[in-house]
Swiss-Prot record:
Annotated domain remarks: The CXXC zinc finger mediates binding to CpG-DNA.
GO molecular function: DNA-binding transcription factor binding; methyl-CpG binding; sequence-specific DNA binding; zinc ion binding
Subunit and interaction comment: Interacts with DVL1. Interacts with RBPJ.
Function: May indirectly participate in activation of the NF-kappa-B and MAPK pathways. Acts as a mediator of BMP4-mediated modulation of canonical Wnt signaling activity in neural stem cells. Required for DNA damage-induced ATM phosphorylation, p53 activation and cell cycle arrest. Involved in myelopoiesis. Transcription factor. Binds to the oxygen responsive element of COX4I2 and represses its transcription under hypoxia conditions (4% oxygen), as well as normoxia conditions (20% oxygen). May repress COX4I2 transactivation induced by CHCHD2 and RBPJ.
Taxonomic classification: Eukaryota, Metazoa, Chordata, Craniata, Vertebrata
Protein name in the entry: CXXC-type zinc finger protein 5
Zinc finger (CXXC-type): 256-297
Length: 322
């Protein structure tokens, strides 16, 4: 009995030991799987940490940091980084990370090509930026040249205008010098008037500064084939009403004309309204006659009688020379 009990106990112990051994082996199996998973996680953790770390700064020969133009390419890494990472990986995760490293290698190659294209684009943009500057400079030079040409044209036009004005002034001076001696033949005593006028012109200022060399107003002279005569307005400017012989003077000056003018000083000349009663007013449309009450008294006289009585004042009548 004892032997049988001991045998059973031995069998139970062996069974228990076998079960324990199997349990131990079973328990050791999950522990080994957990260790493998932890190794894979530990191997993958540096990759995630490496992904989170910023890429190293790349500098060119001048020391300038060369960054890609696109913001999405700032996390790109050189191909050596991915190749070294793939070679340093564990044997267990090598097959798992092989495809991922290949994808990253292709992405790095694409990033490098994009970076090269970006540098080419930057160079092209720099050339384009330099070209508009040169175009702008050439346009500014062309505009300055056009402005200079326009200024020279305006100066030439101004000189031509001044030359024409000088020529016209010289011609007018010559005409006045040619016709002034004829005035002395119009009546007695006119040479004295010329002498007085010349003296006053030398000593006094001209009333017409725009004429320059002319001390008299050319509009006061009427140039006709018969000669040069003073206009009627000249006698009004001279103020001949102060002298008693103004009628005779007006008749003497205007005697060289074929048709005499009104003196403008007598009462009929100063009258401005027609009577509308006389025959001249009634027949004005057919006869073209002036009103009898407005007919100048000096025109009623004969020209010869007026010439005999001419007495000229001592230059005071020609006040426009002063």
């Amino acid at each position: 009995m004892s032997s049988l009990g001991g045998g059973s106990q031995d069998a139970g112990g062996s069974s228990s030991s076998s079960t324990n051994g199997s349990g131990g082996s079973g328990s050791s199996g999950p522990k080994a799987g957990a260790a493998d998973k932890s190794a894979v996680v530990a191997a993958a953790a540096p990759a995630s940490v490496a992904d989170d770390t910023p890429p190293p700064e790349r500098r060119n020969k001048s020391g300038i940091i060369s960054e890609p133009l696109n913001k999405s390419l700032r996390r790109s890494r050189p191909l050596s980084h991915y190749s070294s990472f793939g070679s340093s990986g564990g044997s267990g995760g090598g097959s798992m990370m092989g495809g991922e490293s290949a994808d990253k290698a292709t992405a790095a190659a694409a990033a490098a090509s994009l970076l090269a294209n970006g540098h080419d684009l930057a160079a092209a943009m720099a050339v384009d930026k330099s070209n508009p500057t040169s175009k702008h400079k050439s346009g500014a030079v062309a505009s300055l040249l056009s402005k200079a040409e326009r200024a020279t044209e305006l100066a030439a036009e101004g000189q031509l205008t001044l030359q024409q004005f000088a020529q016209s002034t010289e011609m007018l001076k010559r005409v006045v010098q040619e016709h002034l001696p004829l005035m002395s033949e119009a009546g007695a005593g006119l040479p004295d008037m010329e002498a007085v006028a010349g003296a006053e012109a030398l000593n006094g200022q001209s009333d017409f500064p725009y004429l320059g060399a002319f001390p008299i107003n050319p509009g006061l002279f009427i140039m006709t084939p018969a000669g040069v005569f003073l206009a009627e307005s000249a006698l009004h400017m001279a103020g001949l009403a102060e002298y008693p012989m103004q009628g005779e003077l007006a008749s003497a000056i205007s005697s060289g004309k074929k048709k005499r003018k009104r003196c403008g000083m007598c009462a009929p000349c100063r009258r401005r309204i027609n009577c509308e009663q006389c025959s001249s007013c009634r027949n004005r449309k057919t006869g073209h006659q002036i009103c009898k009450f407005r007919k100048c008294e000096e025109l009623k006289k004969k020209p010869s009688a007026a010439l005999e009585k001419v007495m000229l004042p001592t230059g005071a009548a020609f006040r426009w020379f002063q």
